[in-house]
Amino acid sequence: MLDRLTEFFFPKQVSTFASDIDNLYFFIFYSSVALFLIVVFGMVYLSIKYRHRKGEELKLTSSKDHSNLLESMFFIIPLILVSITFVWGIRSYLKMVIVPDDAIEIKVTGQSWFWTFDYPDGGTTLNELVVPSNKPVKLVLSSKDVLHSFFIPVMRSKMDCLPNRYNVMWFDATKEGVYDIFCTEYCGTGHSQMGAKVIVMQPAQYEEWASELGSEDDDLPLDELGAKLYTKKAVSYTHLTLPTTWLV
């Protein structure tokens, strides 16, 4: 039942800690719904029970001004719920911020309006993050211009990218496939087009891909190599629409 609800509300879970985040969300959601229904039901019930009816004499309610049992419940139940949420949340948070020692480190750079990914062996990809499955991946994020935010929904991973500063996030992908990456911080006219893909491969396939990364350029003529580097590194002005007043 919970798995079906998760699939309905969220993208699929493709990281080791995605289920922790989703389960915590649903715990908070259902706890809030339960408390809401209890309060609303109590208000409606008491409003109906003690409403004044025509032809009846006014009835005085009980003169009892407090209940130790009710007051204890009003304190203890929220305390238990908040304590569970705190412990659950801090454990999930620590899983998300403590990077395993054996993680593959990849540098992520945001720039208006595309992403570049620099790999340990010196290779670079544009708008395609390639990672192995069942292997922790550490992303070191920064920006060349304005504030961006790097978000992989299926990994439940999101982190801001700031100029002159490095932020770190990590994930361990559990399923091979191609998934979406978004920028979730408004960064200019091309913000909505600043998407990318994360490609999760089997470890052996990733090792083969990584060993060939960059080597395909070795035999290229210099003019073709220069054109390829320009395409990878230069800003794509096809995404840039300047107002006519800019030229005035």
Over which residues does each language-model region extend?
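Extracytoplasmic entry segments of secretory-pathway proteins
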Residues: 1-135
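Extracytoplasmic/periplasmic beta-strand context in beta-sandwich domains
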Residues: 106, 148, 194-197, 246
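Electrostatic cytochrome c docking/interface patches
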Residues: 123-124, 204-231
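Membrane-embedded segments
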Residues: 135-186, 190-194
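Short pre-active-site segment immediately N-terminal to redox-active cysteine/selenocysteine motifs
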Residues: 182, 233-234
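Interdomain boundary/hinge segments at the C-termini of tandem beta-sandwich modules
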Residues: 200-202
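Conserved small/polar residues in nucleotide/adenosyl-binding loops
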Residues: 238-244
